[in-house]
Amino acid sequence: MLIKAVAQAVPSYTMSCFKLPDNLCDDLTSMIRQFWWGKKKDEKKLAWISWKRMCQPKENGGMGFRDLKSFNKALLAKQGWRLQSSNQSLFARVFKAKYFPESEFTEASLGNHPSFAWRSIMSAQAVVQKGKRWRVGNGRNIQIWTNDWLPSKSYPRILSPHQPPWENAKVSDLIDEAAGAWNNAMVRQLFSFAEADLVLSIPLSQSLPVDRIVWNGTSKGKFSVCSAYHSIREMGKNSKEECSDDSEMKHLWKSIWKLKLPNKIRSFVWRACREALATKANLKKRKITKDDLCSQCGKGAETSLHLFWFCDKAKEVWCNSKMALPFSLDHSWSFIDVMWQLVKHSSTSPGLMEKMMSLCWEIWKERNSVRNGSGKRESKVLVRNAASLVEEYNAANERVVFKNPEFSTKWHPPDSPRFKMNVDAAVFSDLRAMGAGMVIRDSQGQVLAAMCKRIPANLSALDAEAKSMEIAVHFAWEMGFREVYFKTDSSNLKNILTGLSEAPASLEPVTASILAQLDKFRFISFCHVERDGNRPGHILAKFAKQVGDSVVWLEETPNLIENACSQDVSLCNFGVL
């Protein structure tokens, strides 16, 4: 905590304005590294793990410490992004007038007699160039083959070969402006299968707003130093042909850091998995000692596996704990192999990892205290202390769950003269399409209008919910309803539309189109309801898979939702709600 919150944060202000010399970064890193390994004045300490590995993310087996050079560049990239996106700020106007009056920051050059501040910001130009991406609105400002506009962090630019006469075409040429949707056939004709799917996954708004440059490193399209830092680290990996841990190892490391135990024990488990504990076997490997025999039982080399499971003292502790591993140990294993097996059995034995690792922690503390001259403790004491650690942690971190009163589990009628519209979406992955379903009812529960619509767009669940809501708002207006409650079973969409959270960059055109309609209505409200209270909308959205384009019902109840609507009304009439 001290390293991340203090030592690595102290130079942040300076690093956000200027590029620190590499030697200074190395000196700061050296001091931080020595502090971590406990070095004091005139005292040497062994660095068990390289600092490069310590700076890897926790999910990749590191400690998540910052690499100061990369962090410095990420902070400078923030200034570069401000020059790129905030053209009207005083900071941007001054630098633009002096260094790139006729171009953008990503196209600027160092120029003659540049200031140190400009040199520093320019060192992060490549980061800004790599991270910027166009968010498609109407597509009129985006070149199909020369601009980055695909929603992909790895390949945001079209790689499919040019097809004459499309070399200089713009994204707007792929959009059916009358329908506010992609020209599905044209997209499939021009691009590869995977790229066509990516294009069709971009939600379009019926209002077709202007295109905008966003940051590709975050879902909301806003620059963050954290995302820029990770981008820089990935760029460094690619240049050195390094490989990150595979998905299984990531799962293991994540499981370790999610243990419901104090941080000191999680760090201990991480060190044990990295073979960074000062066991006699590890010390012998580093030629610090010649003897690796276990000092407690004298029956074998003191490896982590021997110390925690095969040593006579460890066996006595485990016997008193009445806990047993749900698998057989192999003498050739290391500590990380045991952890991996425990992770595999965590679903069938919940809480077992926490209990076992807290007991390993007590065994390790006991071993160290005995080596330092303290008296031995009984095994029962170690077991009791380990159990107390788990209980105290759980008690301190117990969460009280409050039921959210803002949504209902069943449908209930609106107050007259208002109306209620249930809206839902369905994603048809096999057809690379989505369905929108909506039904509007009055205070008596009578169906006044309903619609289901199939859209050839390969959208995510949230994008599909937002697109359905946009269609629903326009449909309600066209049908003449001016006071409407719009109900959705997507809490994320409800939070976005009510201002409780920000929309992802890809959704901005759609949510902006929805919110632009608010002034037209005398009353409008967006509410969350659970799936049980949204059954008619859900059924219609699913039914859209069977229709060619759209089906509308006016002043009649569609047969497929008649039972669901009747059940909603009957529950209301009998006062269940």
List each language-model region with its residue ranges.
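A helix-boundary/hinge signal
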Residues: 1-577
